Amino acid sequence: MDIINNNHRDENDDDEEEALSAMSSVPPPRKIHSYSHQLRATGQKGHHRQRQHSLDDIPKITEIVSGCGISGDSSDDEFYPYATTTNSSSFPFTGGDTGDSDDYLHQPEIGEDFQPLPEFVGSGGGVGMFKVPTRSPLHSARPPCLELRPHPLKETQVGRFLRNIACTETQLWAGQESGVRFWNFDDAFEPGCGLSGRVQRGDEDAAPFQESASTSPTTCLMVDNGNRLVWSGHKDGKIRSWKMDYVLDDGDDSPFKEGLAWQAHKGPVNSVIMSSYGDLWSCSEGGVIKIWTWESMEKSLSLRLEEKHMAALLVERSGIDLRAQVTVNGTCNISSSEVKCLLADNVRSKVWAAQLQTFSLWDGRTKELLKVFNSEGQTENRVDMPLGQDQPAAEDEMKAKIASTSKKEKPHGFLQRSRNAIMGAADAVRRVATRGGGAYEDAKRTEAMVLAGDGMIWTGCTNGLLIQWDGNGNRLQDFRHHQCAVLCFCTFGERIYIGYVSGHIQIIDLEGNLIAGWVAHNNAVIKMAAADGYIFSLATHGGIRGWPVISPGPLDGIIRSELAEKERTYAQTDSVRILTGSWNVGQGKASHDALMSWLGSVASDVGILVVGLQEVEMGAGFLAMSAAKESVGGNEGSTIGQYWIDTIGKTLDEKAVFERMGSRQLAGLLISLWVRKNLRTHVGDIDVAAVPCGFGRAIGNKGGVGLRIRVFDRIMCFINCHLAAHLEAVNRRNADFDHIYKTMSFTRSSNAHNAPAAGVSTGSHTTKSANNANVNTEETKQDLAEADMVVFFGDFNYRLFGISYDEARDFVSQRSFDWLREKDQLRAEMKAGRVFQGMREAIITFPPTYKFERHRPGLGGYDSGEKKRIPAWCDRVIFRDTRTSPESECSLDCPVVASIMLYDACMDVTESDHKPVRCKFHVKIEHVDRSVRRQEFGRIIKTNEKVRALLNDLRYVPETIVSSNSIVLQNQDTFVLRITNKCVKENAVFRILCEGQSTVREDEDTLELHPLGSFGFPRWLEVMPAAGTIKPDSSVEVSVHHEEFHTLEEFVDGIPQNWWCEDTRDKEAILVVNVQGGCSTETVCHRVHVRHCFSAKNLRIDSNPSNSKSQSLKKNEGDSNSKSSKKSDGDSNSKSSKKSDGDSNSKSSKKSDGDSNSKSSKKSDGDSNSKSSKKSDGDSNSKSSKKSDGDSNSKSSKKSDGDSCSKSQKKSDGDTNSKSQKKGDGDSSSKSHKKNDGDSSSKSHKKNDGDSSSKSHKKSDGDSSSKSHKKSEGDSSSKSHKKNDGDSSSSYKSQSGKKNSNSSTVEESRNNHNKR
């Protein structure tokens, strides 16, 4: 047809003539006389009787219908039904070809076979917005995905919409409006339960899942892997916990129940996170942020089920309100606006809180407010201002200007003064809007935050802006790769995934460069989570899809080709009959008989019925009121419109047979849709739209109203139009259609949940706004262009041209409709490709439907008044499906193929000046069984060798080493843990967690670890940075620091008072360093034991503010435990130490600076507890130490660097255990050792680098323990200590995975050396 040769009007005429010739070989008899003069005569009644045509002359549909198909009557043999040249006639429909026995698929009145009506195709299709959407078994523009939960019909989700998702290692949890649910990844590829299953509607094709008992709507989720819990925040202000490892008994379908639950906030809980120390943070309205420490929750979680109420009460009372803490004298440093989301910066142990225009940065350990800043990165000094505080000032300013102007001379005229006043007022209002935010500020509102793999923080705004921040809240750079609002983030390795309100997902790298992007859903992406090698995305409609982390890439092509080969296993064909009816009612009302004649008589076999009415109401006041309501979003319709819907519903036996799905009214335009109840499970997602075209595109006397539905997972749009009137207004009608087609945007109907109810922000997110003029064409493709089937019907007002009133009536009386069609404006415009481009209409075989005199039956009722309007086919039905050529057959590539069974007008209805028109379609629909395709997807993932090879590549983890696996800390020690990436090609991503902590008891051999929330760190331990990336062949240094969390007032007789009893004992924590590649699914773990040695027995509180633990301390830096040490660098514990810098605990100390505990202290700076202390810096616990740096445990050591434990050692590097060793490198234990670099244990040690424990140690650098220690830097414990700076103890200070040996035999030294 004309789709192929749409520029050749002559060929189109030939095609139609050829089709018409198929009806009969004998042309219809032409009458040789004309009735034109008789029509003009009004005085002779005989002529009227001769020209009086009634409906008896036109066969009714019941007379046309026969048992084997549609056939014509001899009185109208010019228009036999025939085989059209379109594909719609290429297949005769039989009721059994679909395998479905529903009643609506059969038509006992018409029979199983039918002959489609011939069609006329307009030119101009196939290009631009009139191009048929591309369809295929798999979407060609996005990667193949795991459809964990296929798109459910939103009518099935009322009260059950999914709002958010979160992933554990083995499960995906989803929060919904009635509780929570979870999927096990082991069951991800299992088939759904189907329509006859035990699940509710909407989840028939979803993978098997478990659902909780009903709760208040879930607003946020957070996973606590440390305690195998999932925490959820709810709309009622409660926080609930759920066990991950909940196992149901076989056959037990009872919903699982919550664990701990308490009232956290008065309003909804917007976000819940765990800090680096296991504390639970939550936020709500009014700028409220609360904290529940892990200690309080742990106690409540340990209580029995019958003590559930007591547990909730304990937690609820233990909450810390941060807003109250930062409020001084009624002034608060943070804004009172709603806190939208929280982010745990586990790299630096901080917490971010995002509000509308500001951020607040908190210390996760001390819970102190660190900084408040806005989206531009500027520090906010005064945030909590009452709403509208600036507005009165601006108003006063405006009034002052006006008043001052009135008091002065008025040199200008009245108009000029009025103009100045108006401009001044506008300027003041503009400034108020700027201060208050306005549309510009609203566009920059923060919607989501995420912590990237390299430790940077990213935020997304409503205008699509992506902002990168460092850990201190400094704005680094910003990007914009998409014009729509950012709703969510997700990170995996070195990739950042972004979800937009438009349904797009984009991937960027850590530098902000765009890697890939695709349309993931046809609704907004409101949440994403990563697990099991997939990035799972949740759309507004509740569908969940899993995208392989390797996508886009070679994997996509393999899976796509494999699934395409199995197309017939998951493709299903169904069919449905759709009846559309259009009637311009002219502000009248219809009788029951008229509605039965129009709709009821032909609705017995249809599954979907769509009715469009025009001119329901047309009063000027009503039109103005309707326009005002539309401007503020009111679309509830009018009383008369509701009357029509109810009346038609009664005609269709609405309660028993049909179900009303939706409606939309725009002034005088009304559209409504009904679905047969046995088809109801396959039809839904009703959306509505309206486009006014009258009086400057503002009034609804002309325009269009539309309904969009999903039928067997295919989109269909029905648009009821009333275009511009008058014979000469052809161009205006074309422009009206073009405007409707381009601007019609569907939204949820009034009886469905709005977008914010499903988690979408209420900001301005439209993709067709004028503010988004820069959006590319692909992103703003028209809703109608994306539909699989589009049906336009209504009063199009196209007239007959080039023909007189009398001639038109003459042709009508002769039933020469072929001559009249040549004069049809709409057909001419469609041929020229100026309107309804590429769309089709059945060839008209009924008389013109306009204009008639009311209540005058028959063709004699045409307008005979003064104007004598020429009869015309104003009321039409035009459509398109997914066919791109006449030869296209129904398949997944061409999923909707429609043919017309009936197209006529009800000429016996006389209640209006228009006759109602109806068109019945038979639509074949090819769709996908999502459950079966998910099984095929899983089979390919598990069995295809190429796919397995690509997935195995994702398991590669760069080789990394950790410098130590054992650390000992005491008295604010700091140990540097070095993580090295030995791979020379790929980056390594690491994260450090705490597997648990335990109290060390002498009577126990094994430690019982107690994990904190989300594997948080104990409060005495500070690890920084706890996450980040390591470049190839590089290393990163991690500071592991012991931190005391006490003040002097908490000490009584040297014993801390506010700790638990076990806190006075030694503690041990196990750090886990998780390492993965930039895009790897596997993780390598390194475990590091960290022990905290508590020495409370030696603690005393002195009046001196310093906290030194040495008697004599001089410039000691490090941790020394030696009697004599010189220039030792490490951890020394000596009786005599000079110039030691560290932590000393000696009897004599001079110039101590830090934390010293000695009997003598002079000029000490810090907290000292010593008798004599001079210039000591640190916490020393040595008797004599000089310039010792490190941790030495030797009696005499010089220039030792490392961990030595020898009596005499020189230049030894290694691990020696001999009495005399020179230039050894390692860990030596000899009596004589000089220049030892390693771990030595000798009585005499010179230039020892390591951890030495010798009686004579000079210039030792490391961890030395000697009686004489000079220039030691570390932690010394000696009786004489000068210039001590560091942290020293007399027993055991800082070790890194090694134990000091104190043996003096040569054999043991050689054995240790050989081991090195």
Curated annotation (Swiss-Prot):
Keywords: Hydrolase, Isopeptide bond, Magnesium, Metal-binding, Repeat, Ubl conjugation, WD repeat. Mostly expressed in leaves and flowers and only weakly expressed in roots, stem and young seedlings. More precisely detected in cotyledon tips, hydathodes of leaves and mature pollen grains. WD repeats lie at residues 153-193, 213-252, 264-302, 441-480, 520-557. Induction: Not induced by stresses. It catalyses: 1D-myo-inositol 1,4,5-trisphosphate + H2O = 1D-myo-inositol 1,4-bisphosphate + phosphate. Signal peptide: none annotated. This is Type I inositol polyphosphate 5-phosphatase 12.
